[in-house]
Structures are given as structure tokens and as C-alpha cells.
Amino acid sequence: MPKEKPHVNIVFIGHVDHGKSTTIGRLLYDTGNIPETIIKKFEEMGEKGKSFKFAWVMDRLKEERERGITIDVAHTKFETPHRYITIIDAPGHRDFVKNMITGASQADAAVLVVAATDGVMPQTKEHAFLARTLGIKHIIVTINKMDMVNYDQKVFEKVKAQVEKLLRTLGYKDFPVIPTSAWNGDNIVKKSDKMPWYNGPTLIEALDQIPEPEKPVDKPLRIPIQDVYSIKGVGTVPVGRVETGKLKVGDVVIFEPASTIFHKPIQGEVKSIEMHHEPLQEALPGDNIGFNVRGVSKNDIKRGDVAGHPDKPPTVVRTKDTFKAQIIVLNHPTAITVGYSPVLHAHTAQVPVRFEQLLAKIDPRTGNITEENPQFIKTGDSAIVVLRPMKPVVLEPVKELPQLGRFAIRDMGMTIAAGMVISIQKGE
């Protein structure tokens, strides 16, 4: 059996109107992966004979977005010679941040799109900070709309320098910077003949070289539960994605915070594991599985619980505990003060939390403190805060288990902040 190509998840980030959707559209168009719905529409128009026009396709994609259907991003897939690539989201989508954090979509790499006409803009910075907060290790930069600046190398070099400065201060080291015109198809899939001065990779070549994501098999087992089913003749079947560690048939697993809430171990033996309706003996990180647990009732566990092994159980933050976190405020209408109580979304859990302390404002690029004990924090600020959950929740310090250490803060139907858990303080 030849080894299967690695799967890589990518997100597109960048300032509004810099060309994220057009770049995605061009990638799909030039690799022959335009969504079915659009091909159907095209055929219905009875234009079978005519070739697809890129502009027409982009109009359809735009219409779908305006009707609230982003290019059904969950299914935007294509292949490169050495990778299976899934585009898991493009911002503009209201729940972009929440989706990235709650593990609906763990991104392995980000494509940062910057328009040659504008250079680095506020959202360029915000999205780059966010990529770092979310733990995205690899970035590919495209300097787009090169056709609007006559494919001028000087303009490219100037914008490239701005972006390099921004990303280096955030700790990104090696990243390709590619001059593109998504609208005309320059350097997306096909090499451009308009920029002979550039001899680096096209976007698709850069995507083909994204390092293979490592599977954290040596860490303790963590499976955030998405759903729980009770199946006749089988029993209780929790469903979730293995984030870390491995699960074998015959293992005993314990569920938290269920065990903490019920004051008794909610645990049982794993009788069987299934993935895509096929039985598995062992499940690894990234596997979406259902597993049958003996001795656990469907009413004992729910979405937001996390399964682990009893010798290294998931860490529970109780209502008498607090946790210290670094957050970036993305969108708050006024200001956040002590006492603010929004909802925390982490892995599959959602719990109300309270801001107990605002310890410091920090410079997100260096981590240096810019103000101790601020009275309030507002949109654009990065800060170190202390939060208390109003219900028990499983969280882990980001340094130990990053998959369970990232969270979004939501309120009023929007994502207010993104953050990571620094440490957990047990209360008495």
C-alpha cells in the first residue's frame, strides 16, 4: 500500500476586499474543483458548449455568499501532487473565529492575502495576530492584485517588506511571499509570464510544500464529545474527534466534567470503535469516531464532556477555580471590565464565564506588558486576564495540550475575543 498523501487544512485570512474569495475561486477553477451547485446552474443555462468563464463563476459564488451560503467551505477540497488540501474557512464568515477555535476546523496553515494596492491594513494585522493566537504554525503570503499595479516589482518589494516585518515580530520565520493576480490567474495555479522577475513558487506549489501536520499520539488521550447516541442492542455511543493520544478497544475511559458534576467516576470499558462505519482497533489524533462504552448511560454524558484515560484524566476547571488566559479582543461594542459575563466556547463545550481580573494589557507582538491592572480593555487590545467558569469545564494549559487550551469568547451573537489558557488556579 502506498502511504496516503497527508491531509492539510488551510484557512484564508486578510483584510476585507483584498481578494480572499477570488483567490479561493481561482484555485478551485484552475484545479477543476468548482462546487457542484454551480456546475449544475451552468448546465441549466444550457451553455454546455461554452467554456466556463471565471468572472461568471465568481459572480455565482458571490451570489451564494450574499444569500448567506459561503462557498460551502466545509467541502472545498482539492489535491496537489503531495497533499490533500481542505479549505476550511474564509473570514467574512461570522463564525470564522469560533469555528477555528472550537475545532470544527483546526488549521495547519494560513494563506494571508494582502492587496498590492493597499499593503498591510488593520485587519491584516488582526488576522495575523489571530493566526498566532490560534496556534497556526505555517503562513503563506500572497501579494494580490498585482495587475492593478502593472506587475511592478518595486511595489511588490515594498509591500513584501511590510508583511515580513509584521510576521517576523509575531515569530513567523520562513514563509513564501508570492506576487499574484487571482482575477487573471497569475501565480495561483499557473506560473505568470507577466512577472519574469519572480522565480519563487506559485500558490499551489507553496501549498504542496506545507509540512505534514504532526499527530500528538504521545500526549494523554483527549476526545471532546460532539454527540451521544443510545443504539439498540449496542448501548451508549459517544461521538467525537480524537485530539491527542490514542484510544484502543478494551481501554477504560473516564468522562469530565461529568464525573466532577455527579461526584462519581463516569467511566467504562470501550467495547468497539467505528470510523466512517468501519470498525477500528485503535483511533489516533484527527480521527472522527464513535465508540461504544459499557457501563455509561446516555444520560451521564453530553456534548462538551471530554473522554480521557483514568490515570491522566482531563483537567476540570470548577466554579471555585479560575484560569489565567491571554486574550485578544476582536469585537466589543464598548469595553470589557471586571464582572463581564459572556460565554466561553472551547473544543465542544460552551459555558458562561466571568471576568475576575484584568491583570495587564500586552503588546501582542512582543508579549511585553504595556499597562498593569487596566480599568478596561477594548477592541484591538491583547491582555492577560483571570476568568472563572460558572459551570465546570475541561480546559488544559495551551503549553501542555494546545488543542484544549484555546477558546473563543462570545456574546450578543458575535465573537468578542479569542484566547489561550496560560495556567489553572485551583480554589479551595
Curated annotation (Swiss-Prot):
GO terms for molecular function: GTP binding; GTPase activity; translation elongation factor activity. GO terms for cellular component: cytoplasm. Residues 68-72 are annotated as: G2. Residues 5-217 form the tr-type G domain. Residues 181-183 are annotated as: G5. Mg(2+) binds at S21. Keywords: Cytoplasm, Elongation factor, GTP-binding, Hydrolase, Magnesium, Metal-binding, Nucleotide-binding, Protein biosynthesis. GTP binds at residues 14-21, 89-93, 144-147. Residues 144-147 are annotated as: G4. Pfam families: GTP-eEF1A_C (PF22594), GTP_EFTU (PF00009), GTP_EFTU_D2 (PF03144). InterPro entries: EFTu-like_2, G_TR_CS, GTP-eEF1A_C, P-loop_NTPase, Small_GTP-bd, T_Tr_GTP-bd_dom, TRAFAC_GTPase_members, Transl_B-barrel_sf. Coiled coil: none annotated. Its EC number is 3.6.5.3. It comes from the Archaea. Residues 14-21 are annotated as: G1. It catalyses: GTP + H2O = GDP + phosphate + H(+). Signal peptide: none annotated. Residues 89-92 are annotated as: G3. It is found in: Cytoplasm. GTP hydrolase that promotes the GTP-dependent binding of aminoacyl-tRNA to the A-site of ribosomes during protein biosynthesis. Belongs to the TRAFAC class translation factor GTPase superfamily. Classic translation factor GTPase family. EF-Tu/EF-1A subfamily. This is Elongation factor 1-alpha.
